[in-house]
């Protein structure tokens, strides 16, 4: 789900779907299906998926950044998702990237209505679009550097609708980040592996961790192997279809 989601599955606040703020989605699903239900923030679940099944399986401290219509973060610290006392850990889009976002957290573009149009114009040689894209990358790198110095992760994973733009986003971002960090070491920056199905895969892991003990009667039962869907069969995220 988009927004702050508490342990019971209630949406505390959602700027993406304001009408859901205060809705007890978890209770509604439990009543509808008559079984235990676990609900969480979608970007946090995507981070869980990349840690268990994706590109970050070998590290336990991960910043997962979803870059699409908005910028959101999921944190894995010590091998576990970091929720925070108010379940707000990672809700940093409007703070760490203030120069990129509107009040609703949506990325604002000047030279075209959508990111796809800005990227296409830049590829076609439009100087204004390329300048805007360069400024976007520098602002993104600065925000990531701030988060990196706060968390000191072993890996940064970029997901969301813009993550597949290697030559226009990921490669320039890899070049810009060391300038903003100024550190004698580099933090690996990788593209998310699970695409639009990352949150769904993370939900499977999350549900197993929450309910396996009730089902099997075994505490701390490890998550069994899960075979991710091939990347080319993953359905697009809402960020990619807008």
Give a label for each model feature.
Residues 1-58, 69, 76:
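Mid-protein regulatory/catalytic core that forms ligand/cofactor-binding pockets
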Residues 6-8, 27, 31-35, 52-53, ...:
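ATP-binding/phosphotransfer module of carbohydrate and carboxylate kinases, centering on a glycine-rich
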Residues 13, 63, 190:
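Conserved Rossmann-like nucleotide-binding pocket used by diverse enzymes
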Residues 19-23, 86-89, 112:
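Short, conserved loop/turn and helix-capping segments at secondary-structure boundaries
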Residues 41, 67-69, 160-161, 189:
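Short secondary-structure boundary segments
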Residues 42-44, 86, 194:
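Residues that form or immediately flank small-molecule/cofactor binding pockets and catalytic motifs
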Residues 58-109:
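Glycine-rich phosphate-binding loop of actin/hexokinase-like ATP-binding domains
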């Amino acid at each position: 789900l988009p927004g702050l989601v508490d342990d019971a599955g209630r949406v505390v606040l959602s700027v993406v779907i304001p009408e859901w703020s205060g809705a007890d989605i978890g209770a509604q699903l439990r009543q509808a299906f008559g079984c235990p239900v676990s609900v969480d923030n979608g970007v946090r679940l995507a981070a869980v998926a990349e840690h268990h099944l994706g590109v970050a399986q070998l590290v336990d401290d991960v910043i997962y950044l979803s870059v699409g219509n908005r910028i959101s973060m999921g944190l894995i610290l010590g091998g576990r998702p970091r929720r925070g006392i108010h379940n707000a850990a990672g809700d940093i889009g409007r703070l760490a990237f203030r120069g990129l976002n509107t009040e609703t957290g949506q990325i604002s573009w000047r030279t075209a209505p959508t990111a796809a149009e800005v990227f296409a114009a830049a590829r076609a040689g439009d100087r204004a679009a390329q300048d805007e894209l360069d400024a976007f990358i520098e602002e993104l790198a600065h925000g990531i550097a701030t988060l990196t110095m706060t968390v000191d992760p072993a890996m940064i994973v970029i997901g969301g609708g813009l993550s597949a733009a290697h030559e226009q986003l990921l490669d320039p971002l890899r070049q810009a980040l060391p300038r903003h960090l100024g550190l004698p070491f580099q933090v690996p920056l990788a593209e998310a592996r699970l695409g639009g199905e990352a949150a769904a895969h993370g939900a499977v892991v999350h549900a197993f961790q929450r309910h396996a003990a009730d089902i099997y009667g075994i505490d701390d039962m490890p998550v069994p192997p899960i075979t991710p869907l091939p990347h080319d069969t993953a359905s697009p995220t809402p960020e990619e279809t807008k």
